[in-house]
C-alpha cells in the first residue's frame, strides 16, 4: 500500500506520516509544495526521511502559483465576503495537482492530508482529488481516526516528533498569511501585535509615505514603478514594501464552507494593494454596465474558490467572462502607502473612458442640456407614474404658464 | 407668476433669483434647507431679500435628514460603486419635499433650481418634483437658458451679486462633503491637501489611536462609547472624532447618471466609520444566506438613490427586505481610528451567530468529522462528476484497499 | 419512550410504526396532516390503530396551507428551476409544525418520519424540526436503519401490513401532484398517460376553450369569474377546470437538494394557471425596475423553500420585499384554457402602468421625439465610446453638412 | 449630399426617400436587407428606383443572421422579460452593419432610417451607427421632422406612393414576426385570429401530435429529426412544422427601452420550440451552479440586445461566459408539437449529469444515508441556529434516549 502525503513538516502531518506506517503498514511518499511559505525546506526533507518517508518530493510551484492562480484572482478582484484575498484557498488546488501527479507517477492509490474535519481545507483537498483522480482513495486521518491534539502530542513525544508550543496556527504563501487560534477566537478582542509578521504596526510604520506605480496589461500587473517584472517578483517586492508601511492587515467574521462562522485574521500586503489598484483601474476603463455585472461575476468566482469548487465548470465560464472584460484594463495606477493605508491617488490609461469623455464633455456643453432633459424624462417615466398613481396625484397642466414666458425670453 | 427657488446663497442661485424676476417678472420665494452644510444661514436670508426674494424660508431639516434618510443608508451599507456614501444624493429628495411643501403652501406653480444639465442633481430634483407635484412646472435656468459661467460672472457683477474666486465646487451635509473642479478633474493627479476641510492629513493626525464603540439596534447606531444618543448627534460627534484622525477621504472614478465618468473626491468621516462598523456587525449576526443576498439588495438601493429614483416603488420594496433583515443587527462594534484608518477591532452581540456557534462547535467536535464527509460529498457531487466526465476520468474502485485496512484499526 | 410519527398510511410509515414499537418499545402517536391529498382519512386512522398507534391525530390543515403557504408562493411566482411549483416542498414545513405541536402536547421527545436518505424531504423535515423543536430527537428509520424495499415488503407481509403493487410513488396536496419512479426515471422516455390523474390528455380535452377570469388583490387571487372566494376554494375549483383542459403537466430535469439530478413529473393545473396569470398582471402593474429585481427575489425564495430552508431568516426578508411590491398587483386576468394551453388573453387593473401610459403617450406625441434623442445619446454614451475606442474609430465631424441642410427645412 | 436609407418599401420609408430628395436635394441610396421577411424584393427594388433612388442594394443576410445572431440568442435562451425571443431586436445590428458598409463604399456621410421617436428600433439603429461609423450623421426624419401619419398619407398620395389600408404594423424575419397596432393596443382584449400568419389556431391544428428531435452541439441546433442541417434551414423548417401545430404565439406586456409599457404580440414557432428544447438540454448537462448563474447571464444578454446595446463590451463578456458553459450542451431533445403546445418529452446526452448519476446513485445506495445526514446538518446549521436564537429555543439534550436504544438495535 502506497500513500502520497501532503507534508508540511509540522506536528499533524509528522504524526500522520508515522501513524500510517505503523497502523497501515503503508509506504509513505511525502510531498512538500513550495508556494512561498517561509519554511526551511531542507529541514522538512530531513524530517520526512527521519520519520520514515520512502521518498520525499520538494516542488517549487511559486511561479506557477503566481501565473495560473493568483493572476486569475487579481482579475476577479477576489475578496471572499469582501475581505479575504483567498490566499490559502487559491493554493489548495495547485497542491492537489502536484499530489496527484506524484501519486500517478509513483503508482500510489491513496492520497492523505492533515486537515481536520472542521475547516475549509478538507473541502478543497477532497473535492480536488475526486476531480483529478477519482480512482484514488482519500485518507484524512485527523478526521477519520478522530485524532485529538492531546493524543497527537503524546504520540509525538513517544516517536521523537518535535512538538512546538506555538499558540497560533499559521498558513502562508506569496498571496497572504493567515493566523488562527488562541485569543483570536474571541471576536471582541483586538488581535495582539505578536500575531503579525509581514506587516509592521501603524506606530512603527515610516512617517513618510511611499508611492508605488503598478502597470497593468489585460488586468494583470506587469510592472512596478515603471520596471517590467514577472508577477511572482512583483508580488514578493510589494509584500515587502507595503508590509513595511503596515498595509494589508485583515480582521473579519467569515462564513466557512461547513457553515461555521469564525473570526479570521490575515496579512496580505501585496494582495490588498494590487486589488485596490486593479479595481480603481477598472472604474476608469470599463463601462458602467461591465463594472456592475462583473461585481456579481467576481463574487461568485471568489465564492467558488473559497468553497473548494475550483474544478466546477462554472469557474471556467466565469473566467470566460472575466478574460474578455479585462482586455480593456490597461494602464497605470499610483498607490500611496502610508501608515497602514493604501490609497489610490492617480490612474491613467489609453483605454480610459474618462479622459476621452472629458474631451467630448466640452464639446457637448452647448447642447448637452436638452439631451439630459429627454434622458431624465424617459429614465424616470415609470417611477414617476407609479408614484403618482399610488398617491392619487395626476399631472393636469398641459398648457403651462411658464412655456409662454420662456418663449418671450428666447 | 410665483416661483419657489432652492436657494443656496451662492453665485448660480443668486443669478437665477435675479434673472427670473427680470426676465419672467416672477415673484420668487427662496428656500434654504439646512441639512448640515456649514453656512451662515442668516447671511443667506439677507442675500435672498437683497436680490429680490418676496419671501425666504429657512428650514432646519437636519434631524429629519438623519432619522429618515441617513438611517436607511446605514442599514443599506450605502456606498455607490463601493465608494461614495451618497451624501448629496440622499439629501436631494428631502430638499425636494420641502420645496414642494412651500410651493403648495404659497400657491406657486413653478419650482426652480440651480443645477446644470451635466450632473446628477438635475435628475434627483426633477424626478422628485415630478413625483411629488406633477402639476408643477420645473424651471432649470442654467440648462434651459444655457447660462455659462462667464455670462453669469458678468451678470453678477452688473447686479451686485458677490463673486467668489474659489476653484472648487463644494456640497456639504452631515453625511459628507464633496469637492469638485479644478485640478481634481485630472484623475492622474493626487488631490491637493487644500481641498480637505473635515479631515486632517495622515501626517497631522495624532500619533496615538482612539477607540470608539458604536452600539446598534436593528441596524441603526444608537450609542457612542456607551452613551445613548440621537443619530444626528452621533454623526456630528463622529465626523469630528474620525475627521481628527484623518478618516473618511474618498477618491474614485464614478459613473454619473447621465453616462459620464468623473473623478470624485469626498470627505465622510462618520459615514465611512459607521458603515464599516455596521457591515462588520452584520457578518456576526446575519446568516450567510442573508449576507449574500443583502449585498445585492444594498447595491441596488444605492444605485436607485444615486440615480434620483428615490420615489421608485423598488426602493420601498428593498427597504421591506432590509428592515426585516436588520432585526438581528444588534450589538456593539469597536473601531480604532488611527492615522487615516478606521479598523474594526472588536464586536459583540446577543444575536451573534458566532459566539453560540463556538459553544456548539465544541459539542460537535466528537462527531463533526462524519458530518463534514457527507457534506463535502454531496456539496461537490455535481462539480466532480462534471469535471470527471469532461476529462474522461471515471471512478472505478468500488472496493478499496484502505477500507479493509482502516477496519483493522478501529 | 414516546414517538410522534408522520403517518401517511402507506407501506413505509406503516412498517416504521410497527418497527419502532418492536425494536424500541416505543409508544407511537401517529399524525396525518390533510393538505388536500385524496386519501381516505378514516381508513388511515383505522390502520394506525391496527398497527399499534397509541393515539392518532387527523389534522385538517388545508385552509391554513392555502392561506399561509400557497399564498406566499403565488406572490413569489414560485417555480423552482423555472418549472416546479413547489407543491410538496411547501407543505413540509406546515406538516412539521403540526408534528411539533403534537409532540409538545403529548410530551414526546422524538419525532419520526418515513423519508429515505436520498431525497429532498428529509432536508425539509429535519431542518424544520431542528428549528421548531431543537430539543427533539429526529428518527429517520429508512435511512438510519438502512431499510430496503425488499426487507420492508417481507416485514410487511409478516405483520399484516397491506402491500400495494403500484409502480409510482405519489405525493399530493392542493397545490400539485408529483409522480416518481418506474419508467419515469429514464428522461429520454415520454411519461405514459397512466401516470396522470388530475389532467386529461390533450386528445381528450374539450374541443372548445374555456375562459376563466381571476381577480387579484395585493398579488393574491381573490375571485374566480367575478365571484369572490377563499383561496382554498379557488384552487380546488381551478384544479378541476384547468385539469379538465389538460393544463398543468410538468416534466423536467431537477436538481435535488442533495446534489442529484432527477427527472420529475408533476400535475399542477391551478398552480400553472395562477402563476401565469399573476406574472402577467405584475408586468402590467409593476415598474420595470421592480419586475427585474423581483425575478431575483422570486427565484431565491423558491430555492430556499425547495431546499428546506423555510426557517432561514432570508425567507422573511424576501417576503418583506415581496409584500411591499405586491401592493400594486391588483386587477383581473383572463386566461383561456384550451387543449393543454393556459393562455393569458386579457388583463386590466386600476394600477396599470400601461393604460395611463397610453393616455400620456398621446400627450407626448408632439415632443417625445426630442426626449428620445437625448435619452438614446446618454443611455448609450459609454457603450459607443468604448466600442469606438476599442476599434480605433473616432467621431471627427463637428460641423455636419446635414445640420445646415435641415435648418433650411425648418 | 449622399444619404444611405434603410428601405423596406413601405409607406414610411418611401415617403422619406422622396422627401429627402425634395427637401435636402440629396442623392439617396436605398438598402434592403433580407433577414427572412416575406417580401417581394424585386418589387421593392422597382419602387426604390421609381421614387428616385440613385442606387439600390438588395442584400441577402439570412444565413449570416442565423449563424452570427440567432445562434447566440439560442445559446443565451434569449427571451426578453421571459417572453419575447428578440426577433426584430436581433436583426437591427446586422442591418446597421450593412448600411454602414454601403455608406462607406458609396462615400455617403449620412444614414437615414424610418423609425419613429417612440419605439425601440431608433435606439438600436442610432447606437449601432454611432458605434460602427461615428463620423456619420444619423437622419431620423419621422422623429426629427415630426412627420405624422396623416401628413405622410397626403404626401404619399401627391407623389404616387401607394398607401395600404392595413391596420397592423408588422416586422418579420426568420426568428419571428411581430404585430402591433389596432385593437392589440388594448391589453384587455384577446388578439383577433386575423393578426396571425405563421401559426394556425389551436382549433385548426391537427388532431395528432408531431414529434421533432433536435440535435445540439455546443448549445447550437445542428440537426432536425436526425438530419444534419444548417441553422437557417433548420429554423425555416421548424417555423413551418411548429407553426402548423399552432405553436409560438406570444402575447405579453413589455417594457420598451424608452420607458413605455406596451402590449406586444408575436409569432415565433421555431424560436419558442428551440429555446424550450435548449433549456431542457441545459438542465441535463450543466451543473446546478452553472444553470443558476447562467440564468442571470442570459437575462442580461437579452436585456442588452433588446435595448440596442449590441456594441456594448458587456455583450462580448457575457458571450465569453456562455461559450465556455455551452461546451457541455450536446445531445438530442424530442419535442411533441400538439395543439399549440411544444412539450419536451425526452432528452439524452453523452454529457448528461443525470444518466451517469443514476449509475453512481446505485453505488451510493448503501452509504448515502450518512452522507445526507452530514450534509443536512451543515447545510442548515446557520438557519437553524438563527431561528432558534430569534425564538429563544435552545437545544439542551446532549445525551438522547434514542441513541442508546438504537445501539441495541444495531
From Swiss-Prot, chains A, B, C, D:
Pathway membership: Amino-acid biosynthesis; L-arginine biosynthesis; L-arginine from L-ornithine and carbamoyl phosphate: step 2/3
Reactions mediated catalytically: L-citrulline + L-aspartate + ATP = 2-(N(omega)-L-arginino)succinate + AMP + diphosphate + H(+)
Subcellular location field: Cytoplasm
Cellular component, GO, one term: cytoplasm
Disulfide bond sites: none
Main location per the UniProt record: cytoplasm
Keywords: Amino-acid biosynthesis, Arginine biosynthesis, ATP-binding, Cytoplasm, Ligase, Nucleotide-binding
Highest taxon of the lineage: Archaea
GO biological process: argininosuccinate metabolic process; L-arginine biosynthetic process; urea cycle
Signal peptide: none
EC number: 6.3.4.5
Annotated residues for binding of ATP: 6-14, 114
Residues binding L-citrulline: 84, 120, 124, 169, 178, 254, 266
UniProt-listed SUPFAM superfamilies: Adenine nucleotide alpha hydrolases-like, Argininosuccinate synthetase, C-terminal domain
Chain sites annotated for binding L-aspartate: 116, 120-121
InterPro entries per the UniProt record, alphabetical: Arginosuc_syn_C, Arginosuc_syn_N, Arginosuc_synth, Arginosuc_synth_CS, Arginosuc_synth_type_1_subfam, AS_cat/multimer_dom_body, Rossmann-like_a/b/a_fold
Family assignment from sequence similarity: Belongs to the argininosuccinate synthase family. Type 1 subfamily.
Annotated PANTHER family: ARGININOSUCCINATE SYNTHASE (PTHR11587:SF2)
Self-association and partners: Homotetramer.
Protein name in the entry: Argininosuccinate synthase
Organism: Pyrococcus furiosus (strain ATCC 43587 / DSM 3638 / JCM 8422 / Vc1)
Gene that produces this protein: argG
Amino acid at each position: 500500500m502506497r500513500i502520497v502525503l501532503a507534508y508540511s513538516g509540522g506536528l499533524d502531518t509528522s504524526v500522520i506520516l508515522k501513524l500510517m506506517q505503523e497502523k497501515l503498514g503503508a509506504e509513505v511518499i511525502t510531498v512538500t509544495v513550495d508556494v512561498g511559505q517561509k519554511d526551511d525546506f531542507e529541514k522538512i526533507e530531513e524530517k520526512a526521511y527521519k520519520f520514515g518517508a520512502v521518498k520525499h518530493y520538494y516542488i517549487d510551484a511559486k511561479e506557477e502559483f503566481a501565473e495560473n492562480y493568483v493572476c486569475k484572482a487579481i482579475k476577479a478582484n477576489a475578496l471572499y465576503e469582501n475581505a479575504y484575498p483567498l490566499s490559502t484557498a487559491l493554493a489548495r488546488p495547485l497542491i492537489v495537482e502536484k499530489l496527484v501527479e506524484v501519486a500517478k507517477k509513483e503508482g500510489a492509490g491513496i492520497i492523505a492530508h492533515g486537515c481536520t474535519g472542521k475547516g475549509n481545507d478538507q473541502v478543497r483537498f477532497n473535492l480536488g482529488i475526486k476531480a483529478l483522480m477519482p480512482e484514488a482513495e482519500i485518507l484524512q486521518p485527523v478526521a477519520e481516526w478522530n485524532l485529538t491534539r492531546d493524543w497527537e502530542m503524546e504520540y509525538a513525544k513517544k516517536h521523537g516528533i518535535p512538538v512546538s508550543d506555538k499558540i497560533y496556527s499559521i498558513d502562508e504563501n506569496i498571496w497572504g498569511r493567515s493566523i488562527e487560534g488562541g485569543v483570536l477566537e474571541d471576536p471582541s478582542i483586538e488581535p495582539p501585535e505578536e500575531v503579525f509578521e509581514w506587516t509592521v504596526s501603524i506606530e512603527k510604520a515610516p512617517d513618510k509615505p511611499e508611492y508605488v506605480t503598478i502597470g497593468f496589461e489585460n488586468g494583470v500587473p506587469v510592472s512596478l514603478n515603471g520596471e517590467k517584472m514577472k508577477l511572482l517578483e512583483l508580488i514578493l517586492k510589494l509584500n515587502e514594501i507595503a508590509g513595511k508601511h503596515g498595509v494589508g492587515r485583515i480582521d473579519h467574521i467569515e462564513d466557512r464552507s461547513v457553515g461555521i462562522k469564525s473570526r479570521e485574521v490575515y496579512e496580505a500586503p501585496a494582495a490588498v494593494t494590487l486589488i485596490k489598484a486593479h479595481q480603481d483601474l477598472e472604474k476608469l476603463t470599463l463601462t458602467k454596465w461591465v463594472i456592475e455585472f462583473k461585481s456579481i461575476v467576481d463574487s461568485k468566482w471568489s465564492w467558488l474558490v473559497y468553497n473548494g469548487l475550483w474544478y466546477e465548470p462554472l469557474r471556467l465560464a466565469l473566467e470566460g467572462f472575466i478574460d474578455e472584460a479585462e482586455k480593456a484594463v490597461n494602464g497605470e495606477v499610483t498607490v500611496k502607502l502610508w501608515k497602514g493605508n493604501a490609497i489610490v491617488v492617480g490612474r491613467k490609461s489609453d483605454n480610459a473612458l474618462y479622459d476621452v469623455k472629458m474631451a467630448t464633455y466640452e464639446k457637448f456643453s452647448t447642447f448637452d442640456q436638452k439631451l439630459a432633459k429627454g434622458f431624465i424624462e424617459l429614465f424616470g417615466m415609470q417611477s414617476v407614474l407609479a408614484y403618482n398613481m399610488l398617491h392619487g396625484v395626476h399631472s393636469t397642466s398641459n398648457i403651462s404658464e411658464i412655456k409662454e414666458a420662456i418663449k418671450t425670453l428666447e
